[in-house]
Design a protein with these regions (language model features):
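Terminal-region recognition feature
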Residues: 1-193
Length: 193
């Protein structure tokens, strides 16, 4: 997970909506997460109006399909918060292929979480791209990174069944987890069929 901005042009759309399905098949960055949040809010509003017009007495469902190698951690956390705040609709998140790094926070935002049978999930510690500065800048940066890591551990412990001691070991490595392990750890609820 890094704190870098997208390297892709801003004119392109990377988040697609098809019916009640939202496809996030891209890098996690300010641009793509803003696009995701805006499209989710619009879809939520459309579905609520549709269900009201049809006099359906149930909560609409939105499925977010995630295929991402990760990206900017702050954007991932922003997406997680936005998804979790959508209380008027049921939001399912589904890892499809690879859901790594900052993208796992998008996954954790879902009310129910799933992954396709041949998908993998990767969680790991923060990494820092090249930086320059004075000695005190490095000390400040290290303090900030330690604070972020504590918060990440809190989120994973709160949102999954991974014990803190096991989580510390997982975060030190870059090891992909299959569906069996992700279900055992409570990262996802089930395999999506």
């Amino acid at each position: 997970m890094s704190v870098a901005e997208c390297e892709r042009p801003h004119e392109e759309e990377y988040v697609q909506v098809r019916g009640s399905d939202v496809y996030f098949y891209c890098e996690v960055c300010e641009t793509t997460v803003l696009e995701l949040i805006m499209k989710l809010r619009k879809l939520e509003k459309e579905l609520l109006h549709k269900y009201l017009d049809l006099d359906l007495h149930m909560r609409p469902e939105i499925r977010i399909w995630i295929r991402s190698d990760g990206g900017d951690i702050h954007s991932g956390l922003s997406a997680m918060d936005a998804i979790a705040s959508m209380k008027r609709v049921k939001v399912r998140t589904i890892a499809d292929g690879m859901c790594a790094s900052a993208a796992t926070f998008i996954l954790l935002g879902g009310r129910t979480r799933h992954m396709t049978e041949n998908s993998y999930i990767l969680i790991h510690q923060l990494n820092m791209d090249g930086s320059w500065g004075k000695f005190q800048d490095y000390k400040d940066q290290m303090e900030n990174l330690e604070q972020f890591m504590r918060r990440f551990r809190e989120i994973y412990v709160q949102e999954t069944k991974i014990p803190d001691d096991k989580l510390k070991k997982i975060l030190r490595r870059d090891v992909c987890m299959n569906s069996d392990k992700c279900i055992d750890y409570g990262i996802v609820d089930s395999v999506w069929i």
